[in-house]
């Protein structure tokens, strides 16, 4: 794993509304604004010790990017806690309950969410994830140890928990498994190269980069039909079933971002765009009739580029919120 996994601090705020629900499920509230509980450290990568497996205590607000065994023990009532987990793009994350000692009847809870929720927004979005939002939660207080292991649908997952009684808590083991066709991804790094392949599947896939970046698309293959590529549509991509769009915004949910460009015909690049937003997304929409593929490189914009963005970048929309 790369040692320089960093996220914009204001993107890692856990809203009180995501943790203070009275129901058994956590509701995503889009409009409310709350003060953050805490900012995560800018340097989130943990050094992997030579001993295996890696073990350490889990904090009330935490982020981890490597497998291991993690134990949370309350030293006082901890009512608004969340742990974020992220793997490599080509990995699933499995969360296994080793030991759980919480008081469900007394208001404690321990819930796994398939994806991330930040500032009331979800990744993957409801449009991109195969399950409805409520099905993406696994509540220990409902299932108990009958379901000891929960595997994510992508390279990110998170745990919400509340523990009232000091001394209570839980131990979980985080493992990763290979994902041959990663669909929805949050990048651990501000620069890299990736090929997104969707083979004959009717689904939407988003690759999220939580930095202002320059994206260069070097290869795009869409709509192979009997060995021939579909012709370029007369106008726009709205009428096609297979296309790639570039999105930008200040939140995490791709469905709430601004479309900056769309591509719906094959080409051999390069095509480049600077996206000055806090979050940039390469999103592929597939009809399921073809094998679609897009290869792209991305790098974080330098400060001087943010100040002097011109040409085919989109500074007006994004920089106003920085």
Swiss-Prot record:
Residues 1-24 form the signal peptide. Its main location: secreted. The keyword Glycoprotein applies. Disulfide bonds join 60-81, 104-141, 183-205, 237-264, 277-318. One of its GO terms (biological process) is hormone-mediated signaling pathway. Keywords: Disulfide bond, Glycoprotein, Secreted, Signal. Glycans are attached at residue 204. InterPro entries: CRF-bd, CRF-BP_C, CRF-BP_N, Sperma_CUB_dom_sf. It comes from the Eukaryota. The keyword Disulfide bond applies. It is found in: Secreted. GO terms for molecular function: corticotropin-releasing hormone binding; peptide binding. One of its GO terms (cellular component) is varicosity. Pfam families: CRF-BP_C, CRF-BP_N. Binds CRF and inactivates it. May prevent inappropriate pituitary-adrenal stimulation in pregnancy. Belongs to the CRF-binding protein family. This is Corticotropin-releasing factor-binding protein. The lineage of its organism: Eukaryota, Metazoa, Chordata, Craniata, Vertebrata. The gene is Crhbp.
């Amino acid at each position: 794993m790369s040692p320089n996994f960093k996220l914009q601090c204001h993107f890692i705020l856990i809203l009180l509304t995501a943790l203070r629900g009275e129901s058994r499920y956590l509701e995503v509230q889009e409009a409310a604004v709350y003060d953050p509980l805490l900012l995560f450290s800018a340097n989130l990568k943990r050094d992997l010790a030579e001993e295996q497996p890696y073990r350490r205590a889990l904090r009330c607000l935490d982020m981890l990017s490597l497998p291991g065994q993690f134990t949370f023990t309350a030293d006082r009532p901890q009512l608004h806690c969340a742990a974020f987990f992220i793997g490599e793009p080509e990995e699933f994350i499995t969360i296994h309950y080793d030991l759980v000692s919480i008081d469900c009847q007394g208001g404690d809870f321990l819930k796994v969410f398939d994806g991330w929720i930040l500032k009331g927004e979800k990744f993957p979005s409801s449009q991109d994830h195969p399950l409805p939002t409520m099905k993406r939660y696994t509540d220990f207080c409902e299932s108990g140890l009958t379901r000891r292991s929960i595997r994510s649908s992508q390279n990110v997952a998170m745990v919400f928990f509340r523990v009232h009684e000091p001394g209570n808590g839980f131990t979980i083991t985080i493992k990763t498994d290979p994902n041959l066709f990663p669909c929805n991804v949050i990048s651990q790094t501000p620069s890299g190269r990736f090929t997104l392949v969707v083979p004959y599947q009717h689904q939407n896939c988003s690759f999220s980069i939580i930095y202002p970046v320059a994206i260069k698309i070097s290869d795009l293959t869409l709509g192979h039909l009997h060995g021939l590529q579909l012709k370029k549509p007369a106008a726009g991509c709205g009428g096609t079933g297979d296309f790639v769009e570039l999105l930008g915004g200040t939140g995490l949910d791709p469905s709430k971002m601004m479309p900056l460009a769309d591509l719906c015909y094959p080409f051999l690049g390069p095509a480049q765009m600077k996206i000055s937003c806090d979050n940039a997304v390469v999103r592929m929409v597939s009809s399921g009739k073809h094998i679609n593929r897009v290869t792209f490189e991305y790098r974080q914009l330098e400060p001087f580029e943010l100040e002097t963005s011109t040409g085919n970048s989109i500074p007006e929309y994004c920089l106003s919120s920085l």
